[in-house]
């Protein structure tokens, strides 16, 4: 549009999408995203070859998703608990540092909730640790409640959040 001789542009719409990871070539993105966040997840660095193996196992109780902003890979989501019970679990959620605090985590949690709801689950649960403040803030913002904690009085104290869906 032209307004007083100035071009006006529409604000770009942010588009996130999640795609189930089935091919090893997507494991490169997961390797980079996960390893960048390994310290917050209290995990060791996982090499690309191991991610290739994990993805190709085809475990029916879990699914791996690559989250993209447009076409750019920016997050990794792993869910499990698909086979038994009423609870689904978000077992890993990692967002590339360049994309943190831009809505990717919120999108991934919402995507997992929708996925579980379609599977007939009644509740979503998530483990994190007391020192992972970004994750705790995200889960609480998304309506999750703290239901359990194991206190060893270290940074690795585990917290369990849940939400009825």
Where would I find each of the regions flagged by the language model?
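Acetyl-CoA-dependent GNAT
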Residues: 11-92, 96-98, 109-111, 115, ...
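A generic structural signal for beta-strand entry/edge sites
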Residues: 85-87, 123, 156-158
């Amino acid at each position: 549009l032209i307004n007083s001789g100035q071009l006006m542009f529409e604000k770009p719409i942010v588009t996130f999408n999640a795609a189930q990871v089935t091919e090893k070539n997507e494991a490169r993105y997961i390797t980079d995203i996960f390893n960048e966040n390994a310290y917050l997840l209290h995990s060791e660095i996982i090499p690309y070859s191991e991610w290739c193996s994990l993805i190709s196992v085809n475990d029916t109780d879990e699914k791996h998703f690559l989250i993209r902003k447009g076409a750019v890979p920016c997050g990794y989501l792993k869910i499990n608990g698909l086979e038994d019970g009423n609870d689904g679990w978000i077992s890993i959620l990692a967002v590339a540092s360049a994309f943190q605090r831009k809505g990717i985590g919120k999108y991934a949690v919402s995507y997992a909730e929708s996925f579980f709801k379609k599977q007939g689950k009644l509740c979503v649960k998530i483990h994190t640790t007391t020192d992972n403040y970004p994750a705790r803030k995200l889960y609480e913002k998304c309506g999750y409640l703290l239901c359990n904690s194991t206190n060893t009085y270290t940074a690795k104290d585990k917290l369990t959040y849940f939400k009825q869906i």
